[in-house]
């Protein structure tokens, strides 16, 4: 279970990044606490990525620094094949939560997550509107690891802009985030992990 904790470097205004960076970091801390309460059949890694954001402009080489490095290291160490699945969270704290179906994610894992969301009554938050996110799951997908990106907009969405009107602006502050959004995503992720434990060959 992974997310990034860095925020976009902005010199022209005070950028907090409460949702874009902050929400995933807070989520991972609580998920680590939750998962540590009981024993599990699977081994869980809670991974905090640095350098998800571009230093200048987003390109294949100026972005995803931490996840690219980690995927390369796991490959070199022969550890990558041990990973059954990767669940990435990013920008999950908006007060009006919307998680979109990411076409760059692994199909069977997408289906599992959205099925668990439906079971919990969260279908209005997990939308089957298809998008293609570029995020920290990409290096793992490219390396052959089943991965899913749970990501939503930051602030109100305008036509043609799925990132939200507060994305990378001074409006990305905690006042525009909601604890209930983190709770919803947390419950869905825990249900997904439970399903992976009980049915290791679910794909």
Task: Tell me the role of every PLM-derived stretch.
Residues 85, 94-203:
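Active-site-adjacent substrate-binding region
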Residues 1-14, 188-191:
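Soluble metallo-hydrolase cores and metallopeptidase-like ectodomains found primarily
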Residues 1-3, 47, 150:
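Short, well-ordered beta-strand elements
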Residues 12-112, 120, 124, 129-132, ...:
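Acidic/histidine-rich catalytic neighborhood of metal-dependent amide-processing enzymes
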Residues 4-8, 51-52, 92, 155-156, ...:
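Short connector loops/turns at beta-strand edges and beta->alpha or beta->beta junctions
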